[in-house]
Amino acid sequence: MTAERRRELRRLEGSSVNLALADGSRLDDVSLISAHGLRVWIFDGGEDVFVPLTKVIDFWPAERVGSAA
């Protein structure tokens, strides 16, 4: 992940995001707590989860259901 992309991820801290992982799996609509250091700290299903940054290949903001477009 490029330095610019890491900065973009850090800007999403405190919001809900979707993460695409290197193994082909996804973590959808998780709360991004922190993207500093070598791990991404998320809150998913009532649990803290720490994902190695090297495993994250893409990310984007989660869409809010019922939000006005």
Region spans (language model):
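Short beta-strand-centered aromatic/proline hotspots
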Residues: 27-34
